[in-house]
Amino acid sequence: MKSSLCLAACVTLLAGCASFEPAAPADYQGPTVNVADQVLPVSDQLVHVFEIRRVDGRRLLSSSIATLNANQGRGFSVTPVALSNELPLQPARLQLLATTQWAMPTLALTHPTCQTEGEVSFTPLDGRHYRVAGRIAPDECAVWVEEIESGQPVTSKVTGKGTGR
C-alpha cells in the first residue's frame, strides 16, 4: 500500500514537470532577432525581473528560474542572471512577466512584492535589437518589449498592482 501511494505521488509530481523549449520552433530555418530579458539589481537581496516566459505557447527557460538556480544556497544575497532569446522574424504571441525576486522566499513575506504577467503581440523587424523592459513601483508593476536603440515600446504594456500595500 505504501509503495503504491509513493508511486502515485511520484507520478503526480513528475506529470507537473514541463520541459523548456527554444523560442523558435524546432523546424524554423529562417532569420532570427534577439530579445534580451532584464534582471536589474535593486539591492544585495532584491532584483527586478522583466522576462519572456512563453513564445506562441512554448515554455522558455526564464531569467527568474536561471537567477533562482544560480543563487541556491547563497542565503541573503542574489546575483542577477539575464537570458536572451532568438525569435523568428514573424509575428508572435509573447507571455511577459514583471516580478520582484528576493534572495530568500521568506524576505517576500515582510517586504514589498509585485508580479504581473500577460500576453502581447510582437512583430520583430530585421536588424533591430530588443529587450524586455518594465517598471516596478508602489503604484504599478508593468512589462513590455522595447527597441534598445530608441527605447521605444514595440508591444502593448502589461500592467498590474504595484508594490504598495
Please report, for each region that a protein language model flagged, where it lies by residue:
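Sec-dependent bacterial lipoprotein signal peptides
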Residues: 1-19
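Short loop/turn and low-complexity linker motifs enriched in small/turn-promoting residues
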Residues: 17-122, 129-165
